[in-house]
């Protein structure tokens, strides 16, 4: 079995389910902000294609969560609440953290850019007022395409690369990371 086949193992998600998941996530974020009045870390995955949740995608999310929690511990940022969701729309995780929102964004953006799987993670920071902080505010460039390093949004919008090519690259990155972890 090809490694990309493992990315396809799972149920396809509909556009309606993706929109519902986004709405539920936003509601949970509002609820957490009202309850804790702290910045939130919100993790989703960059998972092209119809299958957003499989054993492989859940491992990718688990790696991200472990890295985020380790970074928070290293910085002595206290995680006062967290929740994880595993729906067909993909693994999600969020946490309310006692930390300055801009510092969270800076460190999470660095993690996304420096970790071998970081390009597969979408780590959003929402400040205690409910404002989502952008990479641009930190002077960071747009997220690069998995294939050609151009602006990922432009490549996605223009459909510059096939789904198979994207999934091959994602599978390669995951394989390399897991192989190196075991060595």
Predicted regions and their residues:
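Long, contiguous binding/interaction regions
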Residues: 1-71, 86, 103-183
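Helix-adjacent hinge/juxtasegments
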Residues: 75-107
